[in-house]
């Protein structure tokens, strides 16, 4: 009987606790919206506090914010106590977000209490047909010094169509227009940007729009981080040597410019006679074993890019000039052999000339004899 009473008591307590939890409710935030301040994709997600029940006025409110581009499979999630959150988006696609209120556990006897979700969305107007939008947009940050972006005109545009590029990154007061366009047939097909102060490791936003008297032009948006599209100069001053007839030692200098030496990774192609293979290193030298001791020549060339310690991605530089070490039977060895042989033959020729010259009679001696004969004959005649 006592056991039955205990079970009844537990049931009553459970119902009481559950009933209390069910009575705790919190409202969602108010006026949730996504705002575009004109920064080419850097948007503000903002809201107002919920209407709070009197007994929860001393409680700390937190907000769970989720947002994404509409074609993304995953949401970004933020827990914050602020009433605004800022982030970059791809404006080529729509944006959607949702938010709800969280009550802190000390106000709810340790249970989690959340409000329903409220949602908001944002998208730019699709002015102009998709075929008028630029094609093949490419941007390269050359040697971490200047940015070059290029594009092709839309598939179906009138001859009077021209494009304009704007850019923005955190630190600028407003979006700026390109001041140095690349042109083809007097049309803008690219832009060069220099002196991008404090622009690394933050989102870099670009918009290319166009104008035509005959039709509207669809805008194109791009967002990236500059350090991830760096294309360095190729390595310089290559040198290769062979030690102990076996060890190949290769050295090169890091390219000139602002990129720290620790930020490079290298790809090396080694050629030994007609065989070649690849290797990689984060240093500016490498030591390998020869694959064939009788090889007549060894050559290598190298390229570089920014490594994972300084960027999430990068673009390989052009290949360096090829540098070669030639074996002992190479052209240099032949020259060393030919020169002394030629000198030896020249010496023999000179010696032979001297010997021949000594064996021939002197012409002055025969002339002297003939003169004496003529004098004697002349004297006999006089007598």
UniProtKB/Swiss-Prot annotation:
Glycans are attached at residues 109, 162, 209, 293. Residues 356-383 are cytoplasmic. Pfam families: IL6Ra-bind. Cleaved by MMP8 leading to a soluble form that is also able to interact with IL13. Disruption phenotype: Il13ra2-deficient mice have greatly reduced levels of IL-13 in the serum but significantly greater tissue levels of IL-13 when compared with wild-type mice. Thus, regulates serum and tissue levels of IL-13. Keywords: Cell membrane, Disulfide bond, Glycoprotein, Membrane, Receptor, Repeat, Secreted, Signal, Transmembrane, Transmembrane helix. Residues 28-128, 131-219, 234-332 form the Fibronectin type-III domain. GO terms for molecular function: cytokine receptor activity. Disulfide bonds join 59-107, 139-149, 178-191, 263-310. Residues 22-334 are extracellular. It comes from the Eukaryota. PROSITE patterns: FN3, HEMATOPO_REC_S_F2. The keyword Secreted applies. A motif (WSXWS motif) lies at residues 316-320. Residues 1-21 form the signal peptide. Belongs to the type I cytokine receptor family. Type 5 subfamily. The WSXWS motif appears to be necessary for proper protein folding and thereby efficient intracellular transport and cell-surface receptor binding. The cytoplasmic domain functions as an inhibitor of IL-4 or IL-13-dependent activation of the Jak-Stat pathway. Interacts with IL4RA. Interacts with high affinity to interleukin-13 (IL13), but not to interleukin-4 (IL4). Cell surface receptor that plays a role in the regulation of IL-13-mediated responses. Functions as a decoy receptor that inhibits IL-13- and IL-4-mediated signal transduction via the JAK-STAT pathway and thereby modulates immune responses and inflammation. Serves as a functional signaling receptor for IL-13 in an alternative pathway involving AP-1 ultimately leading to the production of TGFB1. This is Interleukin-13 receptor subunit alpha-2. It comes from Mus musculus (Mouse).
């Amino acid at each position: 009987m006592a056991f039955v009473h205990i079970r009844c008591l537990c049931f009553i307590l459970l119902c009481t606790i559950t009933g209390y939890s069910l009575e705790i409710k919190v409202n969602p935030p108010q006026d949730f919206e996504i705002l575009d301040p004109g920064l080419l994709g850097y948007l503000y997600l903002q809201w107002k506090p919920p209407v709070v029940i009197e007994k929860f006025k001393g409680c700390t409110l937190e907000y769970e914010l989720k947002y994404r581009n509409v074609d993304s499979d995953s949401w970004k999630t933020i827990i914050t106590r602020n009433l605004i959150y800022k982030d970059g988006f791809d404006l080529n696609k729509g944006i959607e977000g949702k938010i709800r209120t969280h009550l802190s556990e000390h106000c709810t006897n340790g249970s989690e209490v959340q409000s329903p979700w409220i949602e908001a969305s944002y998208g730019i107007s699709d002015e102009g047909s998709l075929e008028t939008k630029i094609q093949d947009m490419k941007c390269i940050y050359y040697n971490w010094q200047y940015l070059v972006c290029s594009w092709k005109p839309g598939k179906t545009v009138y001859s009077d169509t021209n494009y304009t590029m704007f850019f923005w990154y955190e630190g600028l007061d407003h979006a700026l227009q390109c001041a140095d366009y690349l042109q083809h047939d007097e049309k803008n097909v690219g832009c060069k940007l220099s002196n991008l102060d404090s622009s690394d490791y933050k989102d870099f936003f670009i918009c290319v729009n166009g104008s035509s008297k005959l039709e509207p032009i669809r805008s194109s948006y791009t967002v990236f981080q500059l350090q991830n599209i760096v294309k360095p100069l190729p390595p310089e001053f290559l040198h290769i040597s062979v030690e102990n007839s076996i060890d190949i030692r290769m050295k090169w200098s890091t390219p000139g410019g602002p990129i720290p030496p620790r930020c490079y990774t290298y790809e090396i192609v080694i050629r030994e006679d007609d065989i070649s293979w690849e290797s990689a290193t984060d240093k500016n030298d490498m030591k390998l074993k020869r694959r064939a001791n009788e090889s007549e020549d060894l050559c290598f060339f190298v390229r570089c890019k920014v490594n994972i310690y300084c960027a999430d991605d990068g673009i390989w530089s052009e290949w360096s000039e090829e540098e070669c070490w030639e074996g002992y039977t190479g052209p240099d060895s032949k020259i060393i052999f030919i020169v002394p042989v030629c000198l030896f033959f020249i010496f023999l020729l000179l010696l032979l000339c001297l010997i021949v010259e000594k064996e021939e009679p002197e012409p002055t001696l025969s002339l002297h004899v003939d003169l004496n004969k003529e004098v004697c004959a002349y004297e006999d005649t006089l007598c």
